[in-house]
Each structure stands twice: as structure tokens, then as C-alpha cells.
Amino acid sequence: MEGMLSSGDQQRLVSSFLEIAVGQTAETARQFLQATSWKLEEAIQLFYIGNEGGMLQSGTHTQPASNDDAAAQSWGAATGTGNEMILPNDVDEVRAPLPVVRETLYGESMYYGAMRVGNSQPEPNSLIAFRNFSEEPKSPGIWEPDEGDSSASASASASASESASAPRDSLASLYRPPFHLMFQGSFEQAKTTSSSQDKWLLVNLQSTTEFSSHMLNRDTWANDAVSQTIKANFIFWQVYDDTTEGRKVCTYYKLESIPVVLVIDPTTGQRMRMWTGMVDPENLLEDLVPFMDGGPREHFASLSKKRPRGSFSLTPHSKPKEDVAKDEEEEELQRALAASLEDNNMKESSDDQSTIIPEEVAVEAVTSAVLPTFPPLPEEPKGGDRSLQCRVGIRLPNGQRLQRNFLKTDTIQLLWSFCYSQLEESERKKPLKLTQAIPGESKTLEYESNLTLEQSGVANSMISATWE
């Protein structure tokens, strides 16, 4: 490299070196430049590194007396102006060199990994709604503005950057995870808590690569009715699919499509219900009604009652021969009695019809006397002021699910009118019982109370209709 540079180029490099390393000789500059093949930047770094280690204490690197005298004169002139605290031997003092900084570029995987485990996480992308559920609620990030940012001592540049990032933060707040509903802990801890509180475990497995996950945060979990239902009846646990807990859930329940919403029995770990993709709030509320009628313990007790009482007795193939013979004799006697009474029944059928009231007629007479006269059902309100309207979902005894708009000032008697209008003609003579499914425990509605939908708390809720 030295042979390729002319003497003029070498002299310019030496002059540049002396401008940076103030107080050094041309010989010192030439030595460092020759050691680094006349690369100025590397020579400067080598000079400062050697200065820290005391490598420049040899006699060849000392400054000549002429330079010392000139520096002393300049310092003496400065002290003559009134700065008497500066000593002459401070002339040789050189400020500490800047530390050498080496930077390395990493891929995106390292960037996102640092966000999970590091104490200081970089500002995430607005479209990445969440990364670490256990850490994000504790530290102010993209979801919430820092308290220090609003102080009066903020500089003009800081306020400008905040105003530039405001649209991005407002967009991210739309997809904010439901931290007020989420259980903070592992999957096993969530099951333990659900079992101790006798509540179903509602699991939401999310993915940042699927926009449906962010739609669930924006539309479903942010819905007031859904939020109240989950708080009252479920333990909600949300997890990301690339975390350890998320992969565990995917493997255990063999999940192939993300996002997924699961209802899990915390006692047995059994998957009771599953939804994939985006789930509308109204459809989710309708599907959750059966789980609001009772907790996991009641469900387990009902299963134990359905078991046959003779489950631990002998099997039919191992019955004693005496019992089998008795059963055959009883069957023969029943056949003989049926054959002998058949003729008598045919003869007396006409007399029975004229003297005995059929049971069905009696039941119809009783039910028709019990059922009140329902008010006429007005036309469903459409358009107009939405603040005066409400939406009620009803689950009929046959499993059919309906929704209808009412005015908030309508009385609850119209709910019975609507239910009976959707039933078959043969079912309209049976009395119905309406119970409010959300929020909290079920509440039976009284037909005699002349309350409005808003006063009774039925507006924008789910109603379950069953036979009395």
C-alpha cells in the first residue's frame, strides 16, 4: 500500500492524523499509518488504543521542546485572562478517547426473541398487536402512553415524534389484547384456578400471521356483553402459538388452524367446544349459553347420574340360569294376558269414549286456562335512533336460536309473544319459562312484572326459553 501512495498522499494522511491526534509528531503519525497500511481510520483507532495501554511511553514518541514551549505560551496566555486554576503541567493532558463500538446486524428472529426475554423491548409494529402477554401489561408500550411523555419538560423533538407516532398507536389500540379479561399464568395454573372457582376454562390461541386473531381482539373480546359473560362465568386464557405454552396446547388438542377458541373442562382437560377463525360476538354468546347454565362440577355430577346403576353388577352373559328362566316365564304370562284382554278392549272401546275424558283433552284444558293472553307483537324496529333500540337473543326449547330488535321501552311480555310466534301450533299451549343467561347467574323473568327491557336488564342479552 505504501508503494502505491505518492509522497503527497502520504503527507496528506500524516497531516490528517496530526489534526485528529493533537500534539503528536509527524514521526508518530507515520509509524501508526505504516502499521495499518496507510489506513487513516484504523491508524487513529490503534493510536487511541495504544494510548490507553501505555504503549506510547517510549522516547521516540515524546514531543519536542519547541512544541512544549508553544503550548506553554498558549496556556499561559489563557491563564492570564483570569483562569488561575489551570496548572502548566495540564498542557500534556489529552481527553479520554471515545470507546470503540462494534455493531452487528441480526435477523428478525433475533429481534423478536429479544422482545420476549429482554428487559427493554423495542417498539413493536402497530400491526403486531401483542408479543408477550405476561410482560406487556406491566410495562408501558405501544398500547399505553408513558406517563413521562406527558411532562412539561419534553423537548420539541420529542413532541414531534409523539405526534408522528400517534396514528400508529391509535391503530394498535384497536387490536389491543383483552388484558382486563386474561388470566396471567401457565395453562396448568389456569386449569387449577378454573377448577377451584368451578368455572369453565375459555382458551384463545392467537397468531400474529393471521388477521383473524386481531379481529377477535377488536370485535369479539372488546364487546361489552362478551366481556361481562366471560367475567361472570369463565376463566379466560389467551396465548400465542409460537410460545412454549402455545405449542403445548396445539400439540395436546391437535390444533391445525389458528386462531382457535376452546371451552375446556378444567377437571378432566376435555375439550367441550371449539371455534376456529373469527367468531362474531352474537354467535359466541349463543354458543356459550349451555355452559352458563352450570359449572364443570354440575356437569360431572350429571354425567355420574346418567350411568346405569348396575354398572358394577354381573353382565347379561353371566346371569344365573334361574334368573333367565324366571324372565322367560314372565314374558309368556304377559303375552297370554295381552291376548286374553284384546277382545275385551275392542268391545268396551265405544263405551269408554263416551264416558271417559281423554287425558290429552284434560291437559289441553288445563294449559289453556293457565296461559295468559299475550300482547300483540309490534313490527320490528329498523333504522331510526339506535340508542333507543336493543337486541335480544333467544334460545327456544327445541334448540333454535333467534335474534330480534326491540325498543328499550317495550315490556318483557313481548318476549313471550315473540317466542310463541316462533313455535309450532301444537307447542303453543305449553307454558314457557324465560331465564336471563347473562351476566352472572341465571335470573328467571316474571311475566306479571310490567318492567321494560331496559329496566329488567334484558336489553342486549341472551334469553333461554324452557318448558315449565
Swiss-Prot record:
Domain of life: Eukaryota
Residues with the N-acetylmethionine modification: 1
CDD domains: UAS (cd02958), UBA_TAP-C_like (cd14273), UBX (cd01767)
Keyword Acetylation included in the entry's annotation: yes
Cellular component, GO annotation: nucleus
Mutant lacking the gene: phenotype: No visible phenotype.
InterPro entries in UniProt: Thioredoxin-like_sf, UAS, UBA-like_sf, Ubiquitin-like_domsf, UBX_7/2, UBX_dom, UBX_domain-protein, UIM_dom
Tissue note: Expressed broadly in sporophyte and gametophyte cells.
All residue ranges annotated as the UIM domain in the record: 328-347
GO molecular function: protein-macromolecule adaptor activity
Residue ranges constituting the UBX domain according to the UniProt record: 385-466
Biased composition (Low complexity): 150-166
Domain remarks: The UIM (ubiquitin-interacting motif) is required to engage the NEDD8 modification on cullins.
Biological role stated in the UniProt entry: Acts as a bridge between CDC48A and ubiquitin, suggesting a role in targeted protein degradation.
Subunit structure: Interacts with CDC48A via its UBX domain and with ubiquitin via its N-terminal UBA-like domain.
Protein name per UniProt: Plant UBX domain-containing protein 7
Species: Arabidopsis thaliana (Mouse-ear cress)
Gene: PUX7
